[in-house]
Amino acid sequence: MVTQNKKILIITGSFGNGHMQVTQSIVNQLNEMNLNHLSVIQHDLFMEAHPIMTSICKKWYINSFKYFRNTYKRFYYSRPNELDKCFYKYYGLNKLINLLIKEKPDLILLTFPTPVMSVLTEQFNINIPIATVMTDYRMHKNWITPYSQRYYVATKDTKDDFIEAGVPASYIKVTGIPIADKFEESIDKEEWLSQQHLDPSKPTILMSAGAFGVSKGFDYMINNILEKSPNSQVVMICGRSKELKRSLKAKFKDNPSVKILGYTNHMNEWMASSQLMITKPGGITISEGLSRCIPMIFLNPAPGQELENAYYFESKGFGKIADTPNEAIDIVSDLTNNEETLKVMSSKMLESKVGYSTRKICKDLLDLIGHSSQPDEIYGKVPLYARFFVK
């Protein structure tokens, strides 16, 4: 329990929606705990430090799913010594030092890979407690921060990855990836589908265009899924792509087995009411799917963390990878015509999921911060030349 005034600084990043969603889940949970002595602040470090360059990098990141896959692949799978020579390791350093001296946090929580934090812990000898929430299912070197006291990871396999990389087992907690508590709540599937003017007796296929709406060819997929699985119905989530939503609505306006939606706050209800989901394997989306025990098909996952997530889920029997739309259509047909296989996949997910991840993480964070040093003890160790960066 926090009995003295304490402050948590959350460092996150807006490359995709997942890291921000994790941050918001944690902030919401801490706020619900009504801790009068605790303040929580969050910063999108890279965007605040270098807004123009980061905006360019974000556009490149989004487009990398379509045009620059090999470039991103080389970056993601580069060796640690190559990263050490890269400017990325020092990206945001001045801003981070400025934040630490200005805010004087009692604990730093990372919800985004932040290699620059390693520079502080290794070169500046700052010993503020650091905790990291990893938002994917396979470990990557960018998530490791020397002298970090806690890593919150998705599975025991992820923990083993960190141990193999040299992180002490006692620093790693298997909590699952934090998602909103509503994904733990019971949903009346029949009532929800009826409210949405869909048939509760039909298998429902949930399709998502992804956070950036970068995928195309959904009209072809929907037509062929219904042709090969005529007893099914399809719910298509277009995200923020208004053009995709408008196009698909026009094409399927007279088909009662197809529902086209834009951005929705009801992914929880749709996941709980569907038998199968076609999606990109972002860490948060598949964690929500795991919580709802809905088998998934990963369509042409991008090299890097998403492909590693897809490999992991496929190896565990939670989903299948489809390299092409036609392959995805065939997998849908096979699974919807084999109800027992879907049940087995859902059962494996039920056995493996870790519930109430956000609560577990917040409880442990409070324990960590309760044992943290006083700010005067910490900030007396900040080198004088570091103060040059304070604005």
UniProtKB/Swiss-Prot annotation:
Cell inner membrane is among the record's keywords: no
Location in the cell: Cell membrane
Chief location bin: membrane
Coiled coil region boundaries: none
Signal sequence bounds: none
Reaction(s) catalysed (UniProt annotation): a 1,2-diacyl-3-O-(beta-D-glucopyranosyl)-sn-glycerol + UDP-alpha-D-glucose = a 1,2-diacyl-3-O-(beta-D-Glc-(1->6)-beta-D-Glc)-sn-glycerol + UDP + H(+); a 1,2-diacyl-sn-glycerol + UDP-alpha-D-glucose = a 1,2-diacyl-3-O-(beta-D-glucopyranosyl)-sn-glycerol + UDP + H(+)
Keyword terms, alphabetized: Carbohydrate metabolism, Cell membrane, Glycosyltransferase, Lipid biosynthesis, Lipid metabolism, Membrane, Transferase
Function of the protein: Processive glucosyltransferase involved in the biosynthesis of both the bilayer- and non-bilayer-forming membrane glucolipids. Is able to successively transfer two glucosyl residues to diacylglycerol (DAG), thereby catalyzing the formation of beta-monoglucosyl-DAG (3-O-(beta-D-glucopyranosyl)-1,2-diacyl-sn-glycerol) and beta-diglucosyl-DAG (3-O-(beta-D-glucopyranosyl-beta-(1->6)-D-glucopyranosyl)-1,2-diacyl-sn-glycerol). Beta-diglucosyl-DAG is the predominant glycolipid found in Bacillales and is also used as a membrane anchor for lipoteichoic acid (LTA).
Similarity section: Belongs to the glycosyltransferase 28 family. UgtP subfamily.
Protein name: Processive diacylglycerol beta-glucosyltransferase
